[in-house]
Regions:
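Acidic ATP/Mg2+-coordinating residue in the GHKL
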Residues: 112
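Short alpha-helical segment within the cytosolic histidine kinase core of two-component systems
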Residues: 40-52
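Short conserved segment of the HATPase_c
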Residues: 117-129
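Short alpha-helical segment of the dimerization/phosphotransfer core of two-component systems
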Residues: 3-8
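Conserved catalytic submotifs in the C-terminal HATPase_c
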Residues: 29-34, 51, 56-66
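Short helix-loop "hinge" at the ATP-lid/N-box region of the Bergerat-fold HATPase_c
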Residues: 85-86
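Conserved glycine-rich
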Residues: 156-161
Length: 177
């Protein structure tokens, strides 16, 4: 359980990141990077939380996939989705990551067997400060998915979600060149 100070620090940092991205103070610097390495960095960030809940994170990828991405900001975007997957998946659940290659882009699917997102809320979840009804009582401020979409869009990519009562799949479409 987070202390009040930790929650306030998290909120402040999230607001600063959002403000800097929106105002253009920080610009993304895409360069040829390994998506695999970015994913592994994000997994390391949420690993302790997943372990606490006995959640298994799977990412079996024998091929290295490269794309024009800002390493740190893309890791931030993936971490936001992974953090939500761990947060909304019950103990003993599974969070999976899979990369699929297409001619001009890579698709990263992040799936979970969590509580799911009602269909009527799916179009709203990327809005600033939006929190769904099912997130009541679960820590969060409604900035993570908003930031994630902004980060991915600024790199000429996009994000989609498919969800039902058995879990969610967030798909990030990332330009290779």
């Amino acid at each position: 359980m987070q202390t009040s100070l930790e929650k306030l620090t998290f909120l402040t940092n999230s607001l600063i990141k959002m403000s800097r991205l929106e105002s253009g103070i920080i610009s993304l610097k895409p360069e040829k990077n390994s998506l695999n390495d970015i994913v592994l960095q994000a997994v390391k960030t949420v690993y302790a939380k997943a372990k606490e809940k006995n959640i298994t994170i799977t990412f079996d990828c024998e091929q290295n996939f490269e794309a024009m991405l800002d390493f740190n900001w893309t890791a931030e975007a993936i971490t936001n989705i992974l953090d939500n997957a761990v947060k909304y998946t019950p103990s003993g659940g599974i969070v999976g990551l899979e990369i699929t290659e297409y001619p001009s882009y890579l698709r990263l699917d992040i799936s979970d067997n969590g509580i799911g997102i009602p269909e009527e809320e799916q179009a709203k979840i990327f809005g600033r400060f939006y929190r769904g009804k099912q997130s009541a009582g679960i820590d969060g401020v409604g900035i993570g998915l908003y930031l994630t979409r902004d980060i991915i869009n600024k790199q000429k990519g996009y994000i989609k979600v498919a969800s039902d009562e058995n879990g969610s799949v967030f798909s990030l479409f990332l330009k290779k060149d």
